[in-house]
Design a protein with these regions (language model features):
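Short N-terminal binding/cap micro-motifs at the start of the first secondary-structure element
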Residues: 1-3
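C-terminal accessory helical subdomains adjacent to catalytic cores in phosphodiester-
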Residues: 5-20, 26, 30-43, 51-184
């Protein structure tokens, strides 16, 4: 949430929902998607941390949700046409933050080991206080020598390598998300 809010200067014509950070269940996510469709949003982008989808029943519930929204939602009588897209990162969004600085395909056993690597490039704490003090995570990472362009390139590389090797860890589709935001 805080990271995407910090991108509003880069992508001026986007609306970020929800307005607060929240770990959302699949059922809650589905309700939020339906709410966005009813509000007439043309695009709904769902950012998914896959570390919470590694086990059942979450994995199956998530796959069903993706399948449900695989095609655009069209309700012509209501004037609704909405594309719902999912963008995954395994383990978590902080991998994309690390990609601001360097590439890795290392298998992380847990979030703490990933955060330790991120902290080698820029001090980072997963706290509301830190997010506020950083005055925007995107700018904070760039002030500390990272770059969004590098993050996008590294994320795209991780997805390409994932597909070639059939691995199911350490990848981020957030590069593709940034490219989609750029195209809107």
């Amino acid at each position: 949430f805080f990271y995407f809010k910090s991108l509003c200067d880069v992508y001026k014509n986007i609306t970020i929902k929800p307005d607060y950070p929240k770990h959302t269940s699949i059922k809650e996510l589905e309700l939020k998607i339906e709410e966005g469709i009813a509000l007439g949003y043309s695009h709904i982008f769902c950012v998914i941390d896959m570390d919470t989808k590694d086990t059942e029943p979450e994995r199956t519930q998530y796959q069903k949700l993706r399948a449900k929204y695989a095609k655009p939602i069209a309700k012509r009588k209501k004037g609704i046409y909405c594309n719902v897209e999912f963008f995954e990162t395994h383990r978590c969004t902080e991998l994309f933050f690390l990609y601001y600085f360097r590439y890795t395909s290392r298998a992380y056993e847990n979030q703490e080991s990933l955060l330790k690597d991120l902290n080698k490039s820029a001090a980072y704490q997963k706290t509301t206080d830190f997010f506020i003090k950083s005055k925007g995570l995107h700018n904070y990472f760039e002030r500390n020598g990272g770059s969004l362009e590098k993050a996008v390139a590294n994320a795209n590389r991780s997805v390409e390598e994932k597909m070639k090797s059939d691995r199911d860890y350490t990848y981020s589709e957030l590069g593709r998300l940034m490219e989609r935001l750029e195209s809107i």
